[in-house]
UniProtKB/Swiss-Prot annotation:
NCBIfam families to which the protein is assigned, alphabetical: ATPsyn_F1gamma (TIGR01146), PRK05621.1-1 (NF004144)
Gene label: atpG
Cited SUPFAM superfamilies: ATP synthase (F1-ATPase), gamma subunit (SSF52943)
Quaternary structure (record): F-type ATPases have 2 components, CF(1) - the catalytic core - and CF(0) - the membrane proton channel. CF(1) has five subunits: alpha(3), beta(3), gamma(1), delta(1), epsilon(1). CF(0) has three main subunits: a, b and c.
Gene Ontology MF annotations: ATP binding; proton-transporting ATP synthase activity, rotational mechanism
Record-level GO cellular component terms: plasma membrane; proton-transporting ATP synthase complex
Organism, scientific name: Ralstonia nicotianae (strain ATCC BAA-1114 / GMI1000) (Ralstonia solanacearum)
PANTHER family found in the cross-reference section: ATP SYNTHASE GAMMA CHAIN, ATP SYNTHASE SUBUNIT GAMMA, MITOCHONDRIAL
Entries under CDD domains matching the protein: F1-ATPase_gamma
Topological relation to the membrane, as annotated: Peripheral membrane protein
Protein's name in the database: ATP synthase gamma chain
Record keywords: ATP synthesis, Cell inner membrane, Cell membrane, CF(1), Hydrogen ion transport, Ion transport, Membrane, Transport
């Protein structure tokens, strides 16, 4: 059994670790609230663009934007959204497992793939498995800006428009609530009809005609590009909210485990100290009896 000095050192070490995990838990909780607000504030923008784009697309049925052209999938692009940092539980592991399954399915169908990595963890993973990475963006910080994402996203959008790839998929972690996050792989392009179909209420709200400047086609082109960019930004915002939630939960679990370990070590320390005192008393009593 270890001596009391070694046990005291171990207790001190675990206490110091617990201070770190507790501080990280509090920081993650603060960042989580801001990330959730950012995620919620991004939703109305994407929804408003979708409504306007849907109205204009239905008002001009003779024009079909390249993003809406459906082709047989022989080549595909995959945008992978992960975190830049670790210590967030199984968040990255789960979404990268979904990415692996998607890549395997594409490979089994004879579909070539190219990837865009958003986040260091995804970039490292794609490099390890030998995936073809055509663009990436890392170190977004706690406040992602669309300007930083556009360059990496544009590579995939341009490839789809040029017919170099026939579909684009988006992999990220969807935020459900603080305790639950869900890895998803969604089709980003071509845009499906249900994404640009208006409900009866939306048709009522957007029943007017527009005056286009310079022309309807140019406006629809720009709107759909902004809409797809907004979808990717929303995915990044949800991924960041998921990251901070997962990190807060992971650090809380680490702090609770450290507390339990400290309690167990304290018990061992007390038993060891008691055994040492009992031994000393026995030696004293034995020595006195011998005299």
């Amino acid at each position: 059994m270890a001596g009391t000095k070694e046990i005291r050192t171990k207790i001190k070490s675990v206490q110091n670790t617990r201070k770190i995990t507790k501080a990280m838990e509090m920081v993650a909780a603060s960042k989580m609230r801001r990330a959730q607000e950012r995620m919620r504030s991004a939703r109305p923008y994407a929804e408003k663009i979708r409504n306007v784009a849907a109205h204009m697309a239905q008002a001009n049925p003779e024009y079909q934007h390249p993003f809406m052209v459906k082709r047989d999938v022989k080549r595909a692009g995959l945008i992978v959204v992960t975190t830049d940092k670790g210590l967030c539980g199984g968040l990255n592991t789960n979404v990268l497992r979904a990415v692996t399954n998607q890549l395997r399915d594409l490979q089994n169908k004879g579909v070539e793939s190219q990837a865009t990595a958003i986040g260091s963890k995804g970039m490292q993973f794609l490099g390890r498995i030998g995936a073809k990475v055509v663009s990436n963006v890392v170190h977004l910080g706690d406040t992602p800006h669309l300007e930083k994402l556009i360059g990496a996203i544009k590579v995939q959008l341009d490839a789809f428009t040029a017919g170099e790839i026939d579909a684009v998929y988006l992999a990220y972690t969807r935020f459900i609530n603080t305790m639950r996050q869900e890895p998803v792989v969604e089709q980003l392009l071509p845009l499906t009809a249900d994404k640009l179909t208006q409900t009866a209420a939306e048709k009522q709200a957007y029943s007017w005609d527009y005056i286009y400047e310079p022309d309807a086609q140019t406006v629809v082109d720009e709107l759909l590009i902004r809409y797809v960019e907004a979808l990717v930004y929303q995915a990044v915002a949800e991924n960041m909210a998921s990251e901070q939630s997962a990190r807060m939960v992971a650090m809380k679990a680490a702090s609770d485990n450290a507390k339990n370990v400290i309690g167990e070590l304290q018990l061992v320390y007390n038993k060891t100290r008691q055994a040492a005192i009992t031994k000393e008393l026995s030696e004293i009593v034995g020595g006195a009896a011998a005299v």
